[in-house]
Regions:
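Internal, conserved structured core segments that host functional sites
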Residues: 90-147
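Hard-cation-handling environments
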Residues: 50-52, 57
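Short acidic, Gly/Ser-rich segments with clustered Asp/Glu that frequently serve as metal-coordination loops
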Residues: 13-19
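Short beta-strand segments
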Residues: 9-10, 60-61, 101-106
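Glycine-rich loop at the start of a catalytic domain that most often binds anionic cofactors/ligands
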Residues: 64, 68-77
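A glycine-rich helix N-cap at a beta->alpha junction
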Residues: 74-94
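Short catalytic helix/loop segments, enriched in acidic residues and glycine
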Residues: 22-46
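Extreme N-terminal starter segment of soluble prokaryotic enzymes
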Residues: 2-6
């Protein structure tokens, strides 16, 4: 990892302390709590990455429109990216020279009966399958990012 740039994808449903749907809904008191926990989770990752020798960290706030991380509490060494972009990497936009990606706070895939708030991208999509196998967002995102 020495000298590399990390691209950290942050989602809310799988972050520390998110255990009800209200935690994922913009503007609720629970959402504010979840934002604080997600920011702490990401700060722990950022700190660990820098301790491991990376030269930079880009954090993509990927839950909904991407306004979940709290900028004033986020480790200042991380570059925060919000919003949804059509390219060059679908959903991600620019990758800022990242060498590898990490996924934090992702959740169960659509169609997973035992997972917490299971979905893939949106609850309107029942599930996504590739070659007959149901895939989760981390698999989908890894396949998108692998092209870059």
């Amino acid at each position: 990892m020495k000298g590399k740039v990390a691209y950290v994808v942050a989602d809310l449903e799988g972050s520390t302390g998110t255990w009800t749907k209200a935690h994922t809904l913009l503007g609720t008191p629970e959402w504010q709590e979840a934002r604080e926990e997600l920011t702490r989770d990401i700060n722990a990752v950022v700190e660990s990455l820098f301790e491991a020798g990376v030269k930079g960290v880009v954090v993509k706030d990927f839950h909904r429109a991407g306004y979940n991380l709290i900028p004033r509490y986020l480790d200042g060494r991380a570059k925060r990216v919000s919003g949804y972009y059509s390219g060059p990497a679908v959903g991600y936009g620019k990758l800022y020279g990242a060498d590898f990606a990490l996924f934090v706070g992702l959740h169960a895939s659509g169609g997973n009966e035992s997972g917490f708030l299971p979905h893939t991208l949106t609850s309107r999509i029942a599930e996504i399958r590739v070659n007959g196998k149901r895939i989760c967002e981390s698999e989908l995102f890894a396949s998108i990012l692998s092209a870059f």
